[in-house]
Every structure is written in C-alpha cells, then in structure tokens.
C-alpha cells in the first residue's frame, strides 16, 4: 500500500466517527472560505491596478497587514480586516447559500453529532 493509499484509508476510517467527521468538515469549510475570500480580494486588487502597499494605505493600515493577508500560507484574517479591504476594492462581504453538494460535504457532518444528541435527548 502506498503512503497516499494509507493516508486515505486512515482518513476514511476516522470519518466514520461523527465527531471526527464534524471537526474535519468544520476545518475544511474554514480553509475553503478563507482561500476563496483571500483569492478574490487579491484578484480584485490586481485588476484595480493597486499594489499591496497602496491597498494598505487605502485602509489606513501597515503594508505588512495586507501583505500577510494576501500572501500568507497560513492565515486567519479578522472579519473587520476582510471587510475593510473589500470596501477599499469596491466590494462587500456577503454570505450565500451552499450548494446541495457543499451542504452534504460540510453542513451535514457538522450538524450530525449535534442533531443526533438533540433527537436522543442527550446534550
């Protein structure tokens, strides 16, 4: 068995545990959301012809804040920073419903343990 196959075997075994599935889905949702937002902000910044330093000046921030937001491989930006950068680019942060496939992959595992506890009277 290759390392990749072993990884996916372990992963699939862990996902049979509702709490592990919930934690994985929550982390996956967080990563995807941050990636989507950061990539969209950087694409709009580039399309507007703004440097990261100019964008930082537009939000009254140190250039390192924008640089870290748009280039860090591990980042968890604050909502207020995202909202300010979005506004400076003529954008607004908005929540939209997930597709059925996204809900099945993310929402259902996250609610699975909570919903089961509520329906059995445990909690």
Language model region names:
Residues 39-56:
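Short basic helix-loop element that most often maps to the first helix and adjoining turn
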Residues 96-106:
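Short amphipathic recognition helices of helix-turn-helix/homeodomain-type DNA-binding modules
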Residues 24, 28-36, 50, 72, ...:
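Residues at secondary-structure transition points
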Residues 60-76:
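Recognition helix of helix-turn-helix/homeodomain-like DNA-binding domains
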Residues 41, 52, 63, 79-82:
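Helix-turn-helix DNA-binding elements, focusing on the entry/boundary residues of the two helices
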Residues 1-39, 104-123:
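N-terminal flexible/basic segments that precede or flank functional cores
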Residues 80-95:
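DNA major-groove recognition helix of helix-turn-helix/homeodomain DNA-binding modules
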């Amino acid at each position: 068995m290759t390392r990749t196959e072993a990884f996916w075997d372990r992963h699939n075994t862990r996902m049979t545990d509702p709490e592990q599935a919930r934690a994985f889905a929550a982390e996956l949702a967080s990563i995807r959301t941050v990636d989507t937002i950061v990539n969209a902000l950087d694409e709009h910044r580039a399309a507007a012809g703004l440097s990261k330093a100019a964008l930082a000046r537009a939000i009254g921030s140190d250039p390192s804040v924008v640089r870290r937001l748009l280039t860090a491989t591990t980042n968890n930006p604050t909502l207020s920073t995202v909202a300010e950068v979005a506004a400076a680019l003529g954008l607004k942060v908005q929540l939209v419903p997930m597709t059925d496939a996204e809900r099945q992959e993310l929402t259902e595992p996250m609610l699975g343990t909570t919903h089961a506890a509520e329906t059995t009277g445990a909690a």
